[in-house]
């Protein structure tokens, strides 16, 4: 691919409808459909509190991130802001951790999609489906950011329609007007051991499970930097995040726990949404949910490729990754970053097949606490960035509520959750693995500093990498 004459300027090909739909569906992760049954089995109907707490945390984090992103829109998003507010080492570390998170998402989501397709066409092996899906989406991302936006627009629209239809059917059933099944009311919320059958500890445990579902809400601040009016889109996405979480998560999960017993045998294996459809005697419930999950994981895979490549591009532009990763093609797409991110994802698949199981388990576990670590860095960055922006005389057009007290509360809450995870056997290895990976990245700072002759331990100005 030929290089652009302006090798460090990304295109602004995302249209308003692309960014709008991305902001609406960006909070709808595939794990809402795949993993919600695990959280429900853990906490019972009180899983609603788990989603509420996790949702409130995301609302706070998005508000903090938006304050910084509106002031200085940047493809590197929170990594760039950590660079300026905390220090080069912080932006460097969290940028690479975030890139690694999405690199791991690529093969995991591709495998889920491939398994669904394999169940439809058993003659084609799973690995071939996975390869074809990944290469097809990589090719789409290489062409232009407009391709990513257009593809994601339709995938996101399908997710939104599916969830709204599910909520509508559930509401009709709860109201007692559904003619094809004898279900009504919300007694399931308390008739199987009460609303909180396993105690508040189970609610906290379920919240840790649900946190992964929300990862991706921040992508809109990365994508908006490639639109014509990033500030407008970021403000709109931030102001609407409350109703998006309320509708897509709280309302849909309420329908689930109101209609089916939380301790129903086989709930984890069948899935919560499919269980509701089967209860309502919807024909081909499994096929319907397979289609919805396939669309969702494809959307997530598409976004993973986009996000990983943009973070790698931003790291390169700031001197925190080799300069070759900042090259773009004629359509102003960071093609080297896209290819290297896909290559790294394929490498993890090779490790899965040929390395000892413990090695691959460490790689997967190392991404477990990255979401919370990213949120913690965003909160600390916003706490310090407000003062920096004021000192520079920059206009702060969107403000975090009750600054700095609410920011400190969020920092304290995230720290508390990480400590709790450290002492819970189910999440202990994730925190330790993520911590070891972060320490390993930090240890490369002196090497990068010597190689690039940079002072990575100082705060530096934000350089827009659009």
Swiss-Prot record:
<keyword id="KW-1133">Transmembrane helix</keyword>
<feature type="topological domain" description="Periplasmic">
    <location>
        <begin position="424"/>
        <end position="428"/>
    </location>
</feature>
<keyword id="KW-0813">Transport</keyword>
<feature type="topological domain" description="Periplasmic">
    <location>
        <begin position="356"/>
        <end position="358"/>
    </location>
</feature>
<dbReference type="GO" id="GO:0016020">
    <property type="term" value="C:membrane"/>
</dbReference>
<feature type="topological domain" description="Periplasmic">
    <location>
        <begin position="175"/>
        <end position="199"/>
    </location>
</feature>
<protein>
    <recommendedName>
        <fullName>Gamma-aminobutyric acid permease</fullName>
    </recommendedName>
</protein>
<feature type="topological domain" description="Cytoplasmic">
    <location>
        <begin position="380"/>
        <end position="402"/>
    </location>
</feature>
<feature type="transmembrane region" description="Helical">
    <location>
        <begin position="429"/>
        <end position="449"/>
    </location>
</feature>
<feature type="transmembrane region" description="Helical">
    <location>
        <begin position="359"/>
        <end position="379"/>
    </location>
</feature>
<dbReference type="GO" id="GO:0015291">
    <property type="term" value="F:secondary active transmembrane transporter activity"/>
</dbReference>
<keyword id="KW-1003">Cell membrane</keyword>
<feature type="transmembrane region" description="Helical">
    <location>
        <begin position="200"/>
        <end position="220"/>
    </location>
</feature>
<feature type="transmembrane region" description="Helical">
    <location>
        <begin position="154"/>
        <end position="174"/>
    </location>
</feature>
<feature type="topological domain" description="Cytoplasmic">
    <location>
        <begin position="308"/>
        <end position="334"/>
    </location>
</feature>
<feature type="transmembrane region" description="Helical">
    <location>
        <begin position="42"/>
        <end position="62"/>
    </location>
</feature>
<dbReference type="GO" id="GO:0005886">
    <property type="term" value="C:plasma membrane"/>
</dbReference>
<feature type="transmembrane region" description="Helical">
    <location>
        <begin position="119"/>
        <end position="139"/>
    </location>
</feature>
<keyword id="KW-0997">Cell inner membrane</keyword>
<dbReference type="GO" id="GO:0015812">
    <property type="term" value="P:gamma-aminobutyric acid transport"/>
</dbReference>
<feature type="transmembrane region" description="Helical">
    <location>
        <begin position="97"/>
        <end position="117"/>
    </location>
</feature>
<feature type="transmembrane region" description="Helical">
    <location>
        <begin position="335"/>
        <end position="355"/>
    </location>
</feature>
<dbReference type="Pfam" id="PF00324">
    <property type="entry name" value="AA_permease"/>
</dbReference>
<feature type="transmembrane region" description="Helical">
    <location>
        <begin position="403"/>
        <end position="423"/>
    </location>
</feature>
<feature type="topological domain" description="Cytoplasmic">
    <location>
        <begin position="221"/>
        <end position="246"/>
    </location>
</feature>
<dbReference type="InterPro" id="IPR004840">
    <property type="entry name" value="Amino_acid_permease_CS"/>
</dbReference>
<dbReference type="GO" id="GO:0006995">
    <property type="term" value="P:cellular response to nitrogen starvation"/>
</dbReference>
<feature type="topological domain" description="Cytoplasmic">
    <location>
        <begin position="450"/>
        <end position="466"/>
    </location>
</feature>
<dbReference type="InterPro" id="IPR004841">
    <property type="entry name" value="AA-permease/SLC12A_dom"/>
</dbReference>
<feature type="transmembrane region" description="Helical">
    <location>
        <begin position="21"/>
        <end position="41"/>
    </location>
</feature>
<feature type="topological domain" description="Cytoplasmic">
    <location>
        <begin position="2"/>
        <end position="20"/>
    </location>
</feature>
<comment type="pathway">
    <text>Amino-acid degradation; 4-aminobutanoate degradation.</text>
</comment>
<comment type="subunit">
    <text>Monomer.</text>
</comment>
<feature type="topological domain" description="Periplasmic">
    <location>
        <position position="118"/>
    </location>
</feature>
<comment type="function">
    <text>Transporter for gamma-aminobutyrate (GABA). Transport is driven by the membrane potential. Can also transport a number of GABA analogs such as nipecotic acid or muscimol.</text>
</comment>
<dbReference type="GO" id="GO:0009450">
    <property type="term" value="P:gamma-aminobutyric acid catabolic process"/>
</dbReference>
<dbReference type="InterPro" id="IPR011265">
    <property type="entry name" value="GABA_permease"/>
</dbReference>
<feature type="transmembrane region" description="Helical">
    <location>
        <begin position="247"/>
        <end position="267"/>
    </location>
</feature>
<comment type="similarity">
    <text>Belongs to the amino acid-polyamine-organocation (APC) superfamily. Amino acid transporter (AAT) (TC 2.A.3.1) family.</text>
</comment>
<keyword id="KW-0472">Membrane</keyword>
<feature type="transmembrane region" description="Helical">
    <location>
        <begin position="287"/>
        <end position="307"/>
    </location>
</feature>
<dbReference type="GO" id="GO:0006974">
    <property type="term" value="P:DNA damage response"/>
</dbReference>
């Amino acid at each position: 691919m030929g290089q652009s004459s302006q090798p460090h300027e990304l295109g602004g090909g995302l249209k308003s409808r692309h960014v709008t739909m991305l902001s609406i569906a960006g909070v709808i992760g595939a794990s809402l459909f795949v993993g919600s049954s695990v959280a429900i089995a853990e906490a019972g109907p009180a899983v609603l509190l788990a989603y509420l707490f996790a949702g409130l945390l995301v609302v706070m984090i998005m508000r903090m991130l938006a304050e910084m992103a509106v002031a200085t829109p940047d493809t590197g998003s929170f990594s760039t802001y950590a660079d300026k507010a905390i220090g080069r080492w912080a932006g460097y570390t969290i940028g690479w951790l975030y890139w690694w998170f999405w690199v791991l998402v690529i093969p995991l989501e591709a495998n889920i999609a491939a398994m669904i397709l394999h169940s439809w066409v058993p003659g084609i092996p799973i690995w071939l489906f996975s390869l074809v899906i990944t290469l097809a989406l990589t090719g789409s991302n290489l062409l232009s950011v407009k391709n990513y936006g257009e593809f994601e627009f339709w995938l996101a629209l399908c997710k939104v329609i599916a969830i709204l239809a599910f909520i509508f059917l559930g509401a009709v059933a709860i109201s007692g007007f559904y003619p094809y099944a004898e279900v009504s009311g919300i007694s399931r919320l308390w008739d199987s051991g009460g609303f909180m059958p396993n105690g508040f500890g189970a609610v906290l445990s379920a919240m840790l499970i649900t946190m992964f579902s929300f990862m991706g809400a921040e992508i809109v601040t990365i994508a908006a930097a490639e639109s014509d009016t990033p500030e407008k889109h970021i403000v709109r996405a931030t102001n609407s995040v409350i109703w998006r979480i309320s509708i897509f998560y709280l309302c849909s999960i309420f329908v689930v726990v109101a209609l089916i017993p939380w301790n129903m045998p086989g709930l984890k294996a069948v899935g919560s949404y499919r269980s509701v459809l089967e209860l309502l005697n919807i024909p081909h419930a499994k096929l319907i949910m397979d289609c919805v999950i396939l669309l969702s994981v494809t959307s997530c895979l598409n976004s993973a490729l986009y996000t990983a490549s943009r973070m790698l591009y931003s790291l390169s532009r700031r001197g925190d990754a080799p300069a070759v990763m900042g090259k773009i093609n004629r359509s102003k797409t960071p093609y080297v970053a896209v290819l290297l991110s896909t290559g790294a994802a394929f490498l993890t698949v090779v490790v899965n097949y040929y390395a000892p199981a413990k090695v691959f388990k460490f790689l997967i576990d190392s991404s477990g606490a990255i979401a919370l670590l990213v949120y913690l860095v965003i909160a600390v960055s916003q706490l310090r960035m407000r003062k920096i922006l004021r000192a520079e005389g920059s206009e702060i057009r969107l403000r975090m509520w009750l600054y700095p007290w609410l920011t400190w509360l969020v920092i304290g809450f995230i720290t508390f959750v990480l400590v709790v995870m450290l002492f819970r056997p189910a999440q202990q290895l994730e925190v330790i693995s993520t911590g070891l990976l972060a320490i390993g990245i930090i240890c490369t700072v002196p090497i990068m500093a010597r190689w690039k002759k940079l002072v990575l331990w100082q705060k530096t100005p934000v350089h827009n990498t659009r």
